[in-house]
């Protein structure tokens, strides 16, 4: 086990002091005495006064330029920082509080508590740059994580202790789905949750904090935010800060941990900004040449070790709905399950707008989920795939040109498509409909019956946003009554 970082600020180089020689936005060059050059990733502190307010800037060493000069990235705005200002090497990386003290509180990327200033600074702290567990400590996981969301449990089952990606463009429901997952899992989950808000909207962070407080799950959750209005250095490091807190719960307290990250794309985006500021030549589509390395360093630490696990749910924005973009494409390789949110499905009013044909899970195998689950999931996909193939014919020639068999299949596929949607708990205040939680066995039974045609005579609209088939029958009677 790596030794914990304490509050001792004594530098290995004797708290060496340097001076600022250049400031360009968040990039600060600092000159140190010969033989006292700080190591890469060390945190440096600079005291400044702006409009009569004194504050301490944190800089992270990014490059050694030679001639005793280091190039750093500031974690806060550099307004008020001037050439010649004194900079002190702390002798350690950015460190965050760890342990039970972080539960129920909101922190920034530097480990400062935002709702209770000073909290955790006199206790144990860990540096945010850490090595992943060694190969012999890792443990493979194949246990299904039941969510109560039909489309996920049936077609893209999540792995306990695995990494799950929620992919989607702007406005298709990534944040709503991740909030729903927090609500559902945290209520039944006995361990600790850590939420990392990476470069997303401050408003969403506030909403999440209030909702978790209202649901009664905040006392077992640590929230770490580096939002849109913060410098790229902060947005790049906030995921590591949250992950460090999660690693403590896994490695020291031997807990199963839930780690939510919203949004991984903003982590990549911040890395791209920092790379440009450091003068690196951009790679494909303007991203940093170190994209795969940076993603790997983060993802390799999010893993399960013997006897304990980190289950990670990561929202991943897909720019311009282009899945070949290097940012989402680099993330795919690290995930156990991918849930792709589709704009055409969301435009039909089906939520969650999960694309059942492109979403995947490595545990959707008969040897893991069972023969019946596997067979029903494949039959649902077969019907939906056939419907997709017929859509061009329907659009050009109309339904009348289809064979009787295909007409039946299209009607069944439309019912299945609508039945894959359901009401969410977090959306109750907007829809006025209670959220539904459907057990996995019921989901398998219900979809098996729909696939066999038992409900072909029910109107399609009866399947909208329903939980189980009981809800469908009630909706059908209501429609018939009109």
Curated annotation (Swiss-Prot):
Nucleus in keyword set: no
Keyword Lipid biosynthesis tagged: no
Catalytic activity: ATP + H2O + 4 H(+)(in) = ADP + phosphate + 5 H(+)(out)
Membrane topology, as annotated: Peripheral membrane protein
Root EC class: translocase
EC code: 7.1.2.2
Keywords tagged on the record: ATP synthesis, ATP-binding, Cell membrane, CF(1), Hydrogen ion transport, Ion transport, Membrane, Nucleotide-binding, Translocase, Transport
Pfam family for this entry, one: ATP-synt_ab
Residue positions binding ATP: 168-175
Subcellular location: Cell membrane
GO molecular function: ATP binding; ATP hydrolysis activity; proton-transporting ATP synthase activity, rotational mechanism
GO cellular component, one term: proton-transporting ATP synthase complex
Primary localization: membrane
Similarity comment: Belongs to the ATPase alpha/beta chains family.
Function: Produces ATP from ADP in the presence of a proton gradient across the membrane. The catalytic sites are hosted primarily by the beta subunits.
Self-association state and partner proteins as the record states: F-type ATPases have 2 components, CF(1) - the catalytic core - and CF(0) - the membrane proton channel. CF(1) has five subunits: alpha(3), beta(3), gamma(1), delta(1), epsilon(1). CF(0) has three main subunits: a(1), b(2) and c(9-12). The alpha and beta chains form an alternating ring which encloses part of the gamma chain. CF(1) is attached to CF(0) by a central stalk formed by the gamma and epsilon chains, while a peripheral stalk is formed by the delta and b chains.
NCBIfam families in the record: atpD
Annotated protein name in UniProt: ATP synthase subunit beta
Species whose genome carries this gene: Nocardia farcinica (strain IFM 10152)
């Amino acid at each position: 086990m790596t030794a914990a970082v304490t509050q001792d600020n004594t530098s290995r180089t004797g708290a060496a002091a340097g001076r600022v020689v250049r400031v360009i936005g968040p990039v600060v060059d600092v000159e140190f005495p010969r033989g006292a050059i700080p190591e890469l990733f060390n945190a440096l502190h600079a005291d400044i006064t702006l409009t009569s307010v004194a504050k301490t800037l944190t800089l992270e060493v990014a490059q050694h330029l030679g001639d005793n000069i280091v190039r750093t990235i500031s974690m806060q705005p550099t307004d008020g920082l001037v050439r010649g200002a004194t900079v002190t090497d702390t002798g350690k990386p950015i460190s965050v509080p760890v342990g039970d003290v972080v539960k129920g509180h909101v922190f920034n990327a530097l480990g400062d508590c935002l709702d209770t200033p000073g909290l955790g600074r006199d206790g144990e702290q860990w540096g945010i740059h850490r090595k992943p567990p060694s190969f012999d400590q890792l443990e493979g996981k194949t246990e299904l994580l039941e969510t109560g969301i039909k489309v996920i449990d049936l077609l893209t089952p999540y792995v306990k202790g695995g990494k799950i990606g929620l992919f989607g463009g702007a406005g298709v429901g990534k944040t709503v789905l991740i909030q729903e997952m927090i609500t559902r899992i945290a209520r039944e989950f006995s361990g600790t949750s850590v939420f990392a808000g990476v470069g997303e909207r401050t408003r969403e962070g506030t909403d999440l904090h209030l909702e978790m407080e209202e649901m009664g799950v905040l006392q077992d959750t640590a929230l770490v935010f580096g939002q849109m209005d913060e410098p790229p250095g902060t947005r790049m490091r906030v995921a590591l800060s949250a992950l460090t807190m999660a690693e403590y719960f896994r490695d020291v307290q031997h807990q199963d941990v839930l780690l939510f990250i919203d949004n991984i794309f903003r982590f990549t985006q911040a890395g791209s900004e920092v790379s440009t500021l450091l003068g690196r030549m951009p790679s494909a589509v303007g991203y940093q040449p170190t994209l795969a390395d940076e993603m790997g360093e983060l993802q390799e630490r999010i893993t399960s070790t013997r006897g304990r696990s980190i289950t990670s749910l990561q929202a991943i924005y897909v720019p311009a709905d282009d899945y070949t973009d290097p940012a989402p494409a680099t993330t795919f390789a690290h995930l156990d399950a991918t849930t792709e949110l589709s704009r055409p499905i969301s435009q039909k009013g089906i939520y969650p707008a999960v694309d059942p044909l492109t979403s995947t899970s490595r545990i959707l195998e008969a040897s893991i989920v069972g023969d019946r689950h596997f067979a029903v999931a494949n039959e649902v996909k077969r019907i939906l795939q056939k419907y997709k193939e017929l859509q061009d014919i329907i659009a050009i020639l109309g339904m009348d040109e289809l064979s009787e068999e295909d007409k039946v299949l299209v009607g069944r596929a439309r019912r299945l498509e609508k039945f894959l949607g359901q009401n969410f708990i977090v959306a109750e205040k907007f829809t006025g409909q209670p959220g539904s939680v459907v057990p996995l066995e019921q989901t398998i039974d219900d979809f098996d019956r729909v696939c066999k045609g038992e409900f072909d005579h029910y109107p399609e609209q009866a399947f909208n946003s329903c939980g189980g088939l009981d809800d469908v029958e009630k909706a059908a009677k209501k429609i018939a009554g009109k």
